[in-house]
Regions:
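Generic detection of long, well-ordered alpha-helical segments
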Residues: 109-116, 161, 165-173, 242, ...
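Generic detector of well-ordered secondary structure
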Residues: 121, 247-250, 347
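Helix N-terminus capping/helix-initiation residues
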Residues: 81, 203, 238, 259, ...
Length: 391
């Protein structure tokens, strides 16, 4: 392996790309193979590439006068949140279009979401050694989230509130046990001196950004907390949660040079006792490649929306493209009706309302793009100038 490269697409051919490498000291034209012999097939990326597209070539080899990367990242300055990519991996199928649906729908206030926020507060308190009683923890949480708690319909009934508190108290006990035993005895981490809480990462190399729940200071141990259920049928991690950890591991490996074999990544399902809820996640390269392809599709679609608008996409919105036939009962009973309701709002709107929405969405998409990658006519504009500036 010879390293990582930033390249610009010059020409697109059937089995290779002609690109220009912009790495300092390596400025030259070079061929980039779209397929190799070791399962690296990037032909699905070709429809999204145009002349002058920017690519990051990750973990790249030089073979027979051509570059062969392990991963390709489209427009890497356009950072996509790790959770955005992970949420496209559903039990009914993997589809990058879930990003569009999730972005356009209002964010619901549910007891599950509130429980997740409360569990995060509990983990923070346990790591700092507060050992708070549940009533004290609950009071602090409700004081800081009064509006969300008041407007949550599921907490309007006595039964709903009772179930919420029973679940929350159980999770507090599980988290306390995990910090006092698994974290210290099994992982050999001191809660105060050896860990970072909710560190934020910007990874230009992979075109990703994210915030981990817990990370050791030597970057070798990462723990992501989930207050919801694991896949109780298989007793394994939910697919979207697994993908989230795959991407966090990739950020630590490719961006911070931590070897996969030296890394420990865990999903902490605080709904269950630590003996059953703390799951170790290993790197699966097929998952990682698929996740980066989903990330590239999200970027390509966002860039298209910023120039051409969203109208054509919504006019040809295909619900069946969201599923590959898996979990047919879940699809027909829940996912499909939800998508029909989503697109129905747009299709039943007046022509003037749709026209206004389309124009406003295009404006927002353009502003989002400029905020990310900047304006060519204005030096050091956009968030990407933080790593692209020449000073």
């Amino acid at each position: 392996f010879v390293g990582d490269f930033r390249v610009v697409v010059l020409e697109k051919h059937e089995d290779y790309l002609l690109v220009f490498c912009v790495n300092e000291g390596l400025e030259q034209k070079v061929r980039l193979r779209s397929t190799t012999d070791d399962k690296n097939d990037f032909t699905a990326l070709l429809p999204f590439l145009e002349k002058d597209s920017n690519l990051n070539l990750v973990d790249t080899r030089w073979v027979d006068e051509a570059l062969e990367p392990t991963l390709i990242v489209l427009e890497p300055d356009y950072l996509i949140p790790v959770t955005t990519v992970a949420n496209c991996f559903q039990a009914t199928g993997v589809c990058s279009q879930y990003d569009v649906v999730n972005r356009l729908q209002p964010v619901p206030v549910t007891s599950a979401i509130l429980l997740g926020h409360l569990a995060g507060q509990m983990l923070d308190e346990e790591l700092h050694g507060y050992e708070s009683s549940y009533p004290d923890t609950a009071r602090r949480f409700f004081a800081q989230n009064a509006v969300q708690c008041y407007t949550c319909a599921e907490l309007a009934s006595n039964e709903g509130r009772r179930d919420f508190h029973i679940n929350a108290q159980s999770q507090q006990l599980h988290l306390r046990s995990m910090v006092q035993h698994q974290l210290r005895n099994d992982l050999h981490l001191n809660a105060l001196s050896d860990v970072l809480l909710e560190p934020t990462f910007f990874c230009e190399l992979l075109g990703l950004q994210g915030r981990m729940d817990l990370l050791s200071r030597d970057f070798t141990t990462v723990i992501e907390q989930k207050s919801g259920k694991m896949d109780e049928w298989t007793r394994r991690a939910q697919l979207s949660h697994n993908i989230q950890l795959q991407l966090y591991r990739a950020i630590l490996h490719f961006n911070h040079k931590v070897r996969f074999n030296d890394m420990r990544a865990y999903l902490l399902y605080s709904k269950y006792s630590p003996e059953h809820g703390l799951m170790r996640i290993e790197t699966i390269m097929d998952y990682l490649r698929e996740a980066l392809q989903i990330r590239n599709e999200i970027v390509a679609r966002e860039l298209l929306f910023s120039t051409e608008g969203i109208a054509d996409y919504l006019d040809h919105f295909d619900i069946d493209s969201f599923t590959d036939g898996r979990a047919s009962k879940l699809w027909s009973s829940y996912k499909r009706p939800a998508l029909e309701s989503f697109i129905g709002v747009y299709r039943q709107s007046s022509e003037s309302a749709r026209s206004y929405f389309n124009r406003f969405h295009r404006f927002l998409s353009l502003e989002r793009r400029l905020g990310m990658v900047g304006n060519q006519q204005r030096e050091c504009s956009g968030f990407a100038s933080a790593w692209n500036a020449t000073f």
